[in-house]
Amino acid sequence: RLFVRDALSVSAVGDISAADLGPMLDELLGDLPAGEGLKATAVDFAIEGGLTIVDMPTPQSVALFGHAGIDRDHPDFFAAYVLNTILGGRGVESRLSAEVREKRGLTYGVSTFLVGKEEANMLMGQVASANDRIGEAIAVIRHEWIKMARDGVTEAELTDAQTYLTGAYPLRFDGNAKIANILVGMQRQGLSTNYINTRNDRINAVTLSEINRLAAELLKPEALHFVVVGQPKGLNEE
């Protein structure tokens, strides 16, 4: 019921025609049953903001955190995409990395990312730190969540993120396997083939007022839940 022909997405890149590809797919996948298979249903997030600790005897703690995100077809998705880049989606150039890693030395890496699922979208992040410092790292993340929701981003941050996202995009297409993976992802998300031509324009079209309005709507500090695995010191479940 999960693996059915009507639910397949196939992309082929290289010196091959549809006529040549068809028989190969028939041989490889022809025995799969017909039909649409199981469909996901919308999920209501039952978990509330707070902290869950999973005890594990390790020298450092790893935390995953997040709350509800945004649909891929939402009009504000690209504003959310740029916002996440500024918050924690650009490695050491992000706000969280500047505050948690560079200024305080609490971690080697902290990041955030948009998780796009058909019926369960999330804005998530992760960080790892020593058991006696993970509490401080979490406090800084929460503070930056509140700060960005309240104050938004600057014009310079927006421009820098747009330049990075649009400039790095062509580098994803440097091999057949990568291109095929991108095309399958586009199919799964219901995007047209023209998306590749319009994606950068839509990123550059995000305005400061739009992204700051969205920051206040999307970022919900009170809903942020942390799951910490390790033996963190000074933290209690909420």
Q: What would you call each of these model-derived segments?
A:
Residues 9-12, 127, 159-238:
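C-terminal regions of mature proteins
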